[in-house]
């Protein structure tokens, strides 16, 4: 889940928790120059974009394999049951990716973005 809160600057407290979007294992997040929230999802091996007004989720980079899809479904079930899923994070999950997808680096709307992983590789992706 990606949660949204109201921030009270004077006190530093949070209130009015709401769910912006539901997705497997949200990790690193970054606001795009267009105002959408981009989120890396290691378990699904995807980069997702969330419209912050509507909560609509769009896949912007997909490196999910068939085995990875099955692992993601199993991982979601385990998370819902309070169980671990680290044993699902195998090379079969990542396919041709040089490691588990964990983040992204964004430029402006005309620039490519980069996909980061647990290793040292960066993958350059042209925006459509």
Describe each model-derived feature in a short phrase:
Residues 7, 42-43, 52, 117-118:
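Short loop/turn segments immediately following the C-termini of beta-strands
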Residues 19-38, 44, 70-73, 90-111:
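Beta-rich, blade/repeat-based domains predominating
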Residues 112-128:
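C-terminal/domain-terminus segments
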């Amino acid at each position: 889940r990606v949660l949204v809160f109201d921030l009270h600057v004077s006190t530093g407290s949070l209130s009015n928790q709401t769910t912006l979007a539901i997705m497997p294992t949200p990790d690193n997040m970054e606001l795009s120059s267009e105002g959408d929230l981009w989120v890396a999802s290691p378990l699904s091996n995807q980069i997702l974009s969330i419209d912050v007004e509507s909560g609509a989720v769009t896949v912007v980079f997909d490196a999910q394999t068939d085995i990875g899809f099955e692992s993601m479904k199993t991982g979601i079930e385990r998370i819902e049951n309070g169980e671990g899923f680290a044993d699902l994070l195998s090379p079969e999950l990542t396919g041709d990716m040089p490691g588990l997808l964990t983040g992204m680096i964004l430029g402006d709307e005309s620039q490519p973005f980069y996909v980061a992983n647990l290793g040292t590789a960066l993958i350059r992706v042209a925006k459509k």
